[in-house]
């Protein structure tokens, strides 16, 4: 029986023999395509090949493509674990032709592989064709499929299109008949939704182009795109009707049972199925640098992870277990996908951190859910507000709540959940732009409706004239504002940049006839630029013409910091890996801040390398170019884009730096990003770049803060001044500071050792307080001693020394150093069966104002507050020994 790995290899090797290039799977995170959450089919990486935009060295290709369907319209998450064939992660086997062969070759290729290499009985196979595709019908007859097993389908199931317009064409599908013991009918029949006839391969014939009016013409370049689910064909070839009964899933399910100490099959099997599936999707996503968060791809990952973790808890797991399953996955899939082994440490660490975090709130969240649903019956609906509270307070994604209620037959009011989510986002949006409550935003919508949006002129100029179209004060429109008043000024056009994309808003001056205002900040909302202003003289009024001038020095500083973040982003990816993605930024006048996906602190060595690389490209002084193009053209150049950003028909692309192994049309551009901010004209205008440090921003996100230009130079001067002061204090040249410092540290360590030795000698010879000499009490040797100038950390060594000296006995030491009181008790090994050091300690510490303490029968330590009670403490220990 072939394994899943064998089947993958057989498929790829077969098409390699037919002249196909074996192409590696593209990443799950589509390169330069923020419109697509995850790669969900084999053709995604070849999209531009089919349209002719991308020309490759081959015209035939075959792949085993990693796919995830757990977000957007392709969302199988709710069904995963409960059905035989739903997965969040799956592999799509495919063969492709870009204007080379067509139906006459594609259909025989498929038939030969299935009936020859895979040895599937021909009488178990059915095929479908689009109802007008006579050519495909005849080819199927020619390869030997009886007419009664070739079914014409008139629905969209057998016609594929990339979008409302563009390449499209008919499909042909191959089905396997599992037998009449399973309910269901052939494709096109009333019972087609049953499980008897299962689609195993889909062949798409891209032969047409559809236009907006619905008309179609034949394409000059006709292509082939096919897809076969590896898990489905593996189930068939391994003699099962359920993907989760194939060799890979059996292995993962049994591993899940082992780490959760539960049974792999029976009533608990569904939990293991969920865990096995989600382990795959989460591990592959983390290996590509996707980390759990509350937005975008990171939130989808978090949803999948937490669903798996809940099912682990249903199996009785009270501690993190998902990370323990990663080695099992790597052992099964690591050979085909080396990125799993390379990222194993990151995957395990991310699982453990996320599960530890989630387990802290899981029980409380489930209690709230139980309380809220306790009176609900099958068919009832949980209020959306409750589901949102679970999400907002306890980190329960909506589908986790739905999954938890599935067994009770209770639905969730998803519209109510969406409404609560929307209300929170509006509140956050209003607060985020400094405009108060969400209700205040309505005034800006009204202005847009009446006056239109603001035209931004600031890319080309810092000075401009415009007309005041509205004034807003305290959330309401006003006609005018006088000296001393604060007001938001809205004009038809402006050179002032409105805060967005991490770049702060501009400041400057605005003058009108008879008045002036200082612009302290500029915000942007719904296409309006809000000039936050203080009227400094006279009066300004709606309808007035205005002259505007941006603060040039401040704008220049902001530009330098923004351009530096682009260079920093690229340098981070080069140093740490392609998983690095921007998660946030601040480009202010005095500093820059850049948040990025990375799961651990950046080493000093890497920080130095990153800083050097950025400064290299600053000194290169290359031109910074900006171009307007379509999003597709920008992605084709390799432009970095932020997932979740909505792009219009045109985008602004900022490029800088020359690198021999770069990107872009010439392959020599260092950094290319979609960006609406303002930038320097030459990289040299940044001046210099200094990293202040790296810190944690949130789970899986690091933050680098840095300076540029004059601020960076001033920082370096301050650091040089401090170094000169240190050198002077050490009586050394700056270049010799480290050597001198090391010598001082060595000298300090030697003195500390000498002091410790002297303290021990003094203590062993006697000290201040009673009981310095050993005495016989209750038939045991006892030594009680009060010591001044001895720290608590020295007591353990003194106890051991006294044990060696007296041979057999009980020791109590009370020490005071710098106002801190420490107590230690020791019992030699031969007496621990009769008396414990812990009991001696507990008897003594109350006299010095201490409580408790703890340790082992032979050694115990505690603390106190009042050294004057040392004699009483020793007497208390003696009393214990006397019995």
UniProtKB/Swiss-Prot annotation:
Its cofactor is Zn(2+). It comes from the Bacteria. One of its GO terms (molecular function) is tRNA binding. SMART domains: tRNA_SAD (SM00863). Pfam families: DHHA1, tRNA-synt_2c, tRNA_SAD. One of its GO terms (cellular component) is cytosol. It catalyses: tRNA(Ala) + L-alanine + ATP = L-alanyl-tRNA(Ala) + AMP + diphosphate. Its EC number is 6.1.1.7. Consists of three domains; the N-terminal catalytic domain, the editing domain and the C-terminal C-Ala domain. The editing domain removes incorrectly charged amino acids, while the C-Ala domain, along with tRNA(Ala), serves as a bridge to cooperatively bring together the editing and aminoacylation centers thus stimulating deacylation of misacylated tRNAs. HAMAP family: Ala_tRNA_synth_B. Catalyzes the attachment of alanine to tRNA(Ala) in a two-step reaction: alanine is first activated by ATP to form Ala-AMP and then transferred to the acceptor end of tRNA(Ala). Also edits incorrectly charged Ser-tRNA(Ala) and Gly-tRNA(Ala) via its editing domain. This is Alanine--tRNA ligase.
